[in-house]
Each structure stands twice: as structure tokens, then as C-alpha cells.
Amino acid sequence: MNLPRFFEDLSRACSGVVLLLSTAVLSAAEPSLPKVSLHTEPNASLRNEVRQAIAKGLGWLEKSQNTNGFWSTADYPAITALGLAAFEMQPANREHKTTPPAVQRGYAYLLSCVQSNGGIYRKELPSYNTSVSLTALVLANRPEYQPAILKARKFIMGLQTDLNEPGRIDSPFDGGIGYGMQDKNPDLSNTSLALEALYLSKQYVKDHHLEEAGDLNWQAAIHFLQCCQNLPASNAEPWASNDPQNKGGFIYAPGRSMAGETNLPSGRVALRSYGSMSYAGLLSYIYADLKRDDPRVVAVMDWLRGNFTLEENPGMGPQGLFYYYHTLAKALTLYGTETVETSAGRNVKWREDLALKLINLQRADGSWANENGRWFEKDPALVTAYALIALDMIYGKI
């Protein structure tokens, strides 16, 4: 398989990207690792430290895997898929492809979750679990997974929202994808996961000369994305705002921001843009083949530069912090920038700063976890996979 071109751009050391959810409780606090100075100059030593951190994190995943092949819970195959992605993307696979027993068990469990409709899930969150699992199957690059890949693609494409008149884009929700349950509207988080899986698997299908019918309505997907962006020039929704704090950033879904709302001097109420969804929006635009000079891409990059920080998830504080790190690493890598110029005029070498941040946050046993439990980030299996994927992408270019 010739990996998609952007896989190489990720870091020259990894072979994919991914996201997800989990359900577990953080274990008792553990002793901290020796801290790395945030003022250390980037060099071969830092690169070695990143590789060591990755190896230690993967070791923790191997030891913490359930004997049935899943991580954290059997109810959500997406959790296991994220762990598998971390293994597939590790730097060692650049030199010699390895398939340790934990990976073999993980894929066996994943395939046990394949449903007759092509989805990869147990009982809940069919879109969420299928999207992340599809990405992991593509990363494995094994011919025996091709039938599951094709069926999962068809399943995800069938979940794209089309409200009101069929075939006509006449709702802000048209084109998006939600959790895959009838009572759930589409949201940017699930849509970005689905677009990622479909983009990667489309390249896989092309590389292997496989036959399939149909494709996602990408124009409708772009419509949904811009309906989640604070940019009145391309979003006619009444909440979209040009105010300096929010212009260009993204929210969770049309009319809904996890970061709440703010009263503007004009008397209008704006929905607050926030960090993790803004990086998810940038990623999704890239998957949808929007170019760097597209006004929608320019606007979100302006917001991200103005709100760049590794101390919090902008607009959300510590909530979803590792999801933020993971999405930031993917988005800035695919966008193709070595530095981020902040609103203060500082050019940040984001890879080096993020690598040091993650090394400092790694626990003594090799895992990571967030002290804030929102979105299940007290689960070390989830957060360790987030951190490892970010480090995998960073490794090749520091």
C-alpha cells in the first residue's frame, strides 16, 4: 500500500491519525516522572526522550490490555481502536513493522464487533465507534481486513444527515454526522472522526484498486462544517459572530457550544469558539480538500494563532485537554506549519513545546491521565492513546 501523501507529511515516522471516547475511572495518583525543563533546546536528546516516552507508553498499554483484547471497556471498540492506532503509528514501525501479541488481540476483538450492517460497535454510538475502528483497520494494512473496511465505509456514508427535502441542503445540520442514534443531531466531533476515516479509507480503496459504489456528499459536509464556524461571511446562522474573541473559531454543533455563550457590546449573544473544536474544524476542512488560502481556513487559523496555548483547552480550561493536544498535533501537522505566531508576536515551535509538555505529564508507569474527568479523560487508556498519537506525529520532525 502506498500510504496517502499526508501520512508521510504527518511526521515521516507514523502512518495515520485517529480520535475517540472511553469510560473508566482514573487509578490512584502515581509518582511523577522527573520533569524536563521547558527551556531545553530542541536537539537529538529531545528526540530520544520522545521515543523513550512512546516506548514506555506502549509498554503500559500492553500491560493494561484485557485478555479479551480490548482496552478499558468492551462496550466501546473505539477505545481499543485508538490504542491500536498508537501501536501502528509508533516510530519503530518506520524501521521494521511489528505486530506484537497485544495488537493481534486488539484487532481480533475489533473484528468481533463488526455488525451485519457494516458498523463496528456493540450497542451504542455506532458512528463514533465505527469511524475510529475503520481508521485503525486502514492503518493495519492487512488484506483480510478489506471486506470490513468497505462495509464500514458504506455504513458511515449512510449516516450522513439530510433533513427536510431529500437531496437538498436546506438545514444547518445537513451534511453532518452524529453519534449514529436517531435522537442525536450531528456534531463537529463525530463529523471530523467520520471525515477522517472516510478520507483515509478512500485512499486505501484507491491504492488497492477496490471497487465500491457511492461516496459521501462532501459538499454537504462542507456546508455542515461552515455552519459550525463563527464566520458570518459563510455562515448565515444568527449566532455566528465576527467579534474578535470568536471570529473564525468553531463550536460543537450549529447553535451549540460546549464553551457557552457571551454577551457582545452590541447586545447580541455569541456562542463561544473553543480550542479543540477549532482544531477539529481545521482538520475537517483539510479532509474536505479546502486550500490554505480559502477564507474559511484562513479565519480558523487566525483564531488558533490568537488563542494558542498548551496550558489549557482554550475556552474549556482543563476539560478535554488531551483531546485538544491530540487534535492540535494532527491539525497543525496536516496544515503544514513549523511554527505558530501567537497574538503576542511569539513564534512557537509547537512540536518541541508540545513534546516537552507531554513528557512532563507522563506518569511513572508510562501512562497519561487528566485530573479533570470530563469526556472521560481520567481514563488512562484513552488519554495515553491521545498522548502517544500526538508524540508519534511529532517525532519525525524534531
Model-based region annotation:
Residues 20-27:
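Hydrophobic h-region of N-terminal signal peptides that target proteins for export
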Residues 65-66, 114-115:
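A non-catalytic alpha/beta surface segment that caps or lines the substrate-entry region
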Residues 100, 107-110:
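Active-site-surrounding "flap" and adjacent substrate/cofactor-binding loops of secreted or lumenal enzymes
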